[in-house]
Regions:
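Juxtamembrane helix-break-helix junctions at the cytosolic face
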Residues: 48-64
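Hydrophobic transmembrane helix segments
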Residues: 1-46, 73-77
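Hydrophobic alpha-helical membrane segments
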Residues: 43, 63-82, 103-106
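Hydrophobic core of alpha-helical transmembrane segments in multi-pass integral membrane proteins
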Residues: 11-15, 49-52, 102-113
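Alpha-helical membrane-associated segments of multi-pass integral membrane proteins
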Residues: 88-120
Length: 124
């Protein structure tokens, strides 16, 4: 249940980091690497949504998808923080939301790892 909440918060943050939310930089200022980041973000978003859907029926698979999706999202966040995606500076609200998302991603990774370990215990 905690993993589902963390993933839902992450999905909400991803949406807030888009032009549907608080992103104000125009797409015309996006660099080539930024287009790759958009693909990575959508792939991670799809993995998070699939993980939420599968969490209560196939916990092991859901936790693997959550781990992969969370790891994928670190690349666009760090790339944006370094200025690799846009020729304009990061708006303050995006900057703050990305830091919050890093914390949520770390929590998601921890919870997904915990679900994975509990769904497939190692022999003792």
């Amino acid at each position: 249940m905690a993993l589902a909440v963390a993933l839902a918060v992450n999905v909400a943050l991803i949406i807030l980091l888009t032009p549907l939310g608080f992103e104000t930089r125009p797409a015309t200022d996006l660099k080539t690497v930024g287009y790759i980041a958009i693909g990575t973000i959508f792939a991670a978003l799809a993995l998070d949504v699939a993980s939420i859907a599968l969490l209560f029926s196939r916990a092991r698979l859901a936790s693997i998808l959550a781990i992969v999706g969370s790891i994928l999202l670190f690349f666009p966040i760090f790339g944006d923080q370094t200025g690799s995606f846009f020729s304009l500076p990061i708006p303050p609200v995006i900057h703050t939301l990305e830091y919050i998302d890093v914390v949520v991603l770390l929590v998601s990774l921890f919870l997904a790892w915990k679900v994975y370990r509990e769904s497939h215990p190692s022999p003792s």
